[in-house]
Amino acid sequence: MKEIQAIYVDLKKLRNIGIMAHIDAGKTTTTERILFYTGRKHNIGSVDDGTATMDWMVQEKERGITIVSAATTCMWKDHRINIIDTPGHVDFTIEVERALRVLDGAIAVFDAAAGVEPQSETVWRQADKYNVPRIAFMNKMDKIGADFDMAVKSMEKKLKANPIPVQMPMGAEDSFEGVIDLIEMKAIRWLDVEGTEMVYEEIPEKYLAKAEEMREDLLEKLAELDDEIMEMYLEGEEISNELIKKALREATLENKATPVFCGSAKMNRGVQPLLDGVLEYLPSPLDMPPVKGWNSDGEEIEVLPDENEPFTALAFKIQADPYVGKLTFFRVYSGRLEKGSYVYNSTKGKKERISRLIFMHADKREDVEYVRAGDIVAAIGLKDTKTGDTLCDEKRPVILEKMEFPEPVISIAIEPETKKDQDKLSKALTLLSDEDPSFRAYVDNETGETIISGMGELHLEIIVDRLKREFNTNVRVGQPQVAYRETIQVPAEAEGKYIRQSGGRGQYGHVVMRFEPIDLSKTFEFEDRIVGGVIPKEYIPAVEEGVREAAQSGYLSGYPMVGIKAILLDGSYHEVDSSEMAFKIAASMAFKEAVKKAQPVLLEPVMSVEITTPEEYMGNIIADLNSRRAHVESLDSRGHLRIIKALVPLSEMFGYATDLRSQSQGRATYTMVLAKYAKVPDKIAERIISK
């Protein structure tokens, strides 16, 4: 095993890349082979038998899908490559977003038999958002139905990308025998099963015509992007391979083209040329535009990738670790940092000490003495740092652009099975929500239940699974819940009189009050209109308190009441018997009496839902929304996609992630936030109240 830690390469020889793909395109296998050929692994792991290095959580080994982006470092031809493995399942897009934010480039892996699949579109859109340069790998060329030309065309059609093949396959399915390098115009074959012996040879006669035609296409596409090549191409001059690579690198870095490679990671064919492509076409930290940040005066500053600049880094992932507690992954953008030194968390305004710095190799770790600009590293010792926080030098405080995380869209109640589980639960939930900003946990004051919220049903399933496995906490899972409210529709007046005479000191409180409906965004307002001291000043706060407490439990179904203004009009008091308690009780009596006359109604949370879908699924999606009592507000276009905005009651949205996935073959995505509370239709309200 080569030691990585001693090798600090020049910045231009560093690559920070992600590997992104649809769930079954063979991404983890591709990563595995990269680790094998770069000498980081002695035996080849396989997802099918659960020995893949990157999929190191137990759930991943069982489900065969990648959930956590593990960061790994390896060497290839005196370059260092840091790889972030990203999940391909739609419930984990937060992991993909967070990885893309700290990467410089990416390999997009496609299944050559399926071409662009639904999640590939989602991930591609996320990569577009962060302007991440990409190269593509058409994997599974040995699979039945593998069709390189179809797969490349699907990139143009579905992703609106500009794919430029730099290789073509020799054969496909079970006759797949190697690849042709269209720049060098050589055939590449692998001689052994493990794919370590690779030879370049002349192109076999039967593939020559096709290879020449594809090289011509490559030059034509490059000529459109590069003036120098255009001139030489039109003049019929010989264009050198060096010039082709230079022009293609520039086009890739500007996101104007995507070089396409092919092979079969599982059959150990095509991975080494793909690694060469990472060095050839993907950016080093020096090729990236400077990162923007803001200093303590709120002025924008540029953070340059230079180890002589002050230290600046972005924490992009927290991982709860059973052995060391908490690992904080961060990307260093400038400067250098020694282990044992202090960093300033400018987001929180706190200083923290880093006890250890670690380069991660999937689930193994190597301690290092220092890190510098360009590195992706894990640290131990940062207690207060959360995902998205900036770490920097106290002498030059800077805050980098925050990461945006979507609001959770599904909630369920959980309860511990035993008292022992209860004690462990809150600690475990705190650790898990530190680790994953799209996961929330809180105790509902109204019901006393522990509620967990996340990005989808699979997301919460895995959280519950992790509670059991990693934290030995067993929980029972309830049905998804909705937080209803109540309000009044018309003004009403009532009198509240509380008198008790039973020997000794009595109780006396008397109020006359009016209650009016106000905007539902306001919970409660209080106005005192008492004149001439008919109720002494010291009892007025008790009147307000009495109404506030009574409003916590509504008349119809016991839900909290909102949108009410209470006006104290009149009343009376007793020199000896009046007390704060008596006025509190009198006020709550007046409130309960008035609410009955004020036409109380039930309110429900209404969500603002935004759905992004390819056009062909729009009709089905809108029909389904209508069946959920939705009000469609607008339909917009973004390229070949349609954006549907609608208001939908939360109670109608349970199971929506799964339904939308099946209506659009997984190609549509949605976000959902609370828009307002609105009156529940009478028929539905009757059903809820009768429960």
UniProtKB/Swiss-Prot annotation:
GO BP terms in the entry: ribosome disassembly
Gene: fusA
GO CC aspect terms: cytoplasm
Residues given in the record as GTP binding sites: 21-28, 85-89, 139-142
Major location category of this protein: cytoplasm
Top-rank taxon, per record: Bacteria
Gene3D superfamilies hit by this protein: 3.30.230.10, 3.30.70.240, Elongation Factor G (Translational Gtpase), domain 3, P-loop containing nucleotide triphosphate hydrolases, Translation factors
Family: Belongs to the TRAFAC class translation factor GTPase superfamily. Classic translation factor GTPase family. EF-G/EF-2 subfamily.
Protein name: Elongation factor G
This protein's UniProt keywords: Cytoplasm, Elongation factor, GTP-binding, Nucleotide-binding, Protein biosynthesis
tr-type G domain residues: 12-286
Described function: Catalyzes the GTP-dependent ribosomal translocation step during translation elongation. During this step, the ribosome changes from the pre-translocational (PRE) to the post-translocational (POST) state as the newly formed A-site-bound peptidyl-tRNA and P-site-bound deacylated tRNA move to the P and E sites, respectively. Catalyzes the coordinated movement of the two tRNA molecules, the mRNA and conformational changes in the ribosome.
PANTHER family tied to this protein: RIBOSOME-RELEASING FACTOR 2, MITOCHONDRIAL, TRANSLATION ELONGATION FACTOR G-RELATED
